[in-house]
């Protein structure tokens, strides 16, 4: 735009060229002011972008720190859960071993009960024929006095002892 104005002024003469140059100078000054204004805006925008990038980096760093703290917390929580599972598993194994022992005791006691019931049935069915002629009962010096004497039944009151390893080997549970 300045070139056209200067061309037109150079064809018209010296006087008009001075006034045109003055206009051109004032145009240059406004252009300079405009450029300065644009440069100032660019500087402000760059500074604003730098601040925005800094804030963004800070947000990202804070987010990373938060995630790192969360990972640490979750790992600690996971370790506690794993430890709890180990304790629970140990309790389970212990209780299972105790249950195996109790099952073995139940089997033995059922066997003893069955044997005693068979003896009682035999004694009741046989009581009419043995010892009646002599006046002796079966339990007062008669045939079964040695078997049914409470003093001879002491071994029945002994606790059944089984170890966890033998119970596991026997039952394979």
From Swiss-Prot:
| Record's GO cellular component terms | nucleus
Q: Where is this region: Basic motif?
A: 41-62
Basic and acidic residues: which segments have biased composition? 30-41
Q: Provide this UniProt record's keywords sorted from A to Z.
A: DNA-binding, Nucleus, Transcription, Transcription regulation
**Where does the record place the region Leucine-zipper?**
67-81
Q: Which SUPFAM superfamilies match?
A: Leucine zipper domain (SSF57959)
Record keyword Transcription regulation present: yes
Query: Per the record, which residues fall in region Disordered?
Result: 1-65
Question: What is this protein's tissue specificity according to the annotation?
Answer: Expressed in the micropylar endosperm and radicle tip in early germinating seeds.
**Alphabetical list of CDD domains matching this protein:** bZIP_plant_GBF1 (cd14702)
Which InterPro entries would you find in this protein's record? bZIP, bZIP_plant_GBF1, bZIP_sf
Cellular localization per UniProt: Nucleus
GO molecular function annotation: DNA-binding transcription factor activity; protein heterodimerization activity; sequence-specific DNA binding; transcription cis-regulatory region binding
Give the knockout phenotype. Answer: No visible phenotype under normal growth conditions, but seeds have decreased germination speed after imbibition, without affecting overall germination rate.
Q: Where is the composition biased (Low complexity)?
A: 8-22
Where's the bZIP domain?
Answer: 39-102
Domain of life per record:
Eukaryota
* Gene Ontology BP, a term: seed germination
PANTHER family reported for this sequence: BZIP TRANSCRIPTION FACTOR 44
Function according to Swiss-Prot or TrEMBL: Transcription factor that binds to the DNA G-box motif 5'-CACGTG-3' of MAN7 promoter. Involved in the positive regulation of seed germination through MAN7 gene activation. MAN7 is required for both, loosening of the micropylar endosperm, and rupture of the seed coat in germinating seeds.
State whether it acts alone or in a complex, and with which partners, per the record: Forms heterodimers with BZIP1, BZIP9, BZIP10, BZIP25 and BZIP63.
What name appears for this protein in its UniProt entry? bZIP transcription factor 44
């Amino acid at each position: 735009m300045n070139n056209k104005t200067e061309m037109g002024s150079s064809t018209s003469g010296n006087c008009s060229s001075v006034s045109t140059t003055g206009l051109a100078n004032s145009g240059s000054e406004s252009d300079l002011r405009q450029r300065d204004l644009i440069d100032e805006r660019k500087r402000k925008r760059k500074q604003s972008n730098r601040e925005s990038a800094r804030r963004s980096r800070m947000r990202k760093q804070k987010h990373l720190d938060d995630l790192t703290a969360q990972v640490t917390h979750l790992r600690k929580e996971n370790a506690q859960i794993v430890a709890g599972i180990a304790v629970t598993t140990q309790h389970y194994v212990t209780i299972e071993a105790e249950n195996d022992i109790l099952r073995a005791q139940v089997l033995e006691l059922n066997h003893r009960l069955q044997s005693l019931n068979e003896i009682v049935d035999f004694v009741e069915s046989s009581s009419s024929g043995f010892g009646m002629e002599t006046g002796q009962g079966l339990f007062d010096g008669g045939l079964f006095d040695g078997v049914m004497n409470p003093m001879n039944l002491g071994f029945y009151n002994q606790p059944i002892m089984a170890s966890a390893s033998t119970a596991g080997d026997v039952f394979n549970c």
